[in-house]
């Protein structure tokens, strides 16, 4: 920290001091906003008169951090709301799809045995009738 006696003794020298206070927040659109309050003091003479405060805002879009599988193809048009798909294999739709496939498999399996049963009964009927006649 620079005191008044340091300023008086080093009045001819040039001192540069930067103080940076950084705060960040994420808004609802998925944009990370970083706000920096930079307090720049360019010389000892300017330090007593006034300190210049600059506010810089950087916007970093989270959209660029998505996996290629999560980016939608817009043919050159920028998509303002990225679609984020779940990466887990066992999602609710997958479970429902699996249950539907199991039900379909059971129905097909029962139809197969029903058809096989009909075929065997017919075969037995014709074989028994041929031997009896």
From Swiss-Prot:
This is Uncharacterized 14.6 kDa protein in psaC-atpA intergenic region. Residues 44-79 are annotated as: Disordered. Keywords: Chloroplast, Plastid. It comes from Chlorella vulgaris (Green alga). It is found in: Plastid, Chloroplast. Its main location: plastid. Residues 63-79 have a biased composition (Polar residues). One of its GO terms (cellular component) is chloroplast.
